[in-house]
Amino acid sequence: MATTRLIPLHTGKGRKFGKAIRNVIGYVSNPKKTHQGELVTGFGCNPETADGEFLLMKREYIARTGRRRGKDDVIAYHLRQSFVPGEITPEEANRIGCELAKRFTHGQHAYVVATHEDRRHVHSHIIFSAVNLDCDRKFRDFFRERTSTGQTERYTVRGKRAVDH
């Protein structure tokens, strides 16, 4: 089973939206960690320009809805998925990461999946835009709501075991 963690990303600490997204996508897409970029996949965006595309979606969302949040605004989400060492190839992990992202967002949000092979355990980072592809809605984090009420379930991913942290 794989462990998966969802982390909301905020601008915070004086950073602008574009810089915050550029920093996180730059980190997860690092060629040294992703087999020279071969383990980076995008949906609804080009991984090389995803930061700019996420920014355009955010601006379009504000223009369409008139909704603007402050510093606490969630600009994107970061899913981390880790596997037990030796149990999965980086290519399989990337494919499973893409499947998870598609299921998690219902194919409605642009995302970048970057699989790292620089540690003992293979792990994927999934960054997806908080704004949907139609730029008229934002992702609602029902998973975190269920977690806080103790209603989460353990999901297995193709029989893979969890990494102990």
Tell me the role of every PLM-derived stretch:
Residues 1-165:
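N-terminal nicking endonuclease/strand-transfer module with a His-rich metal-binding environment
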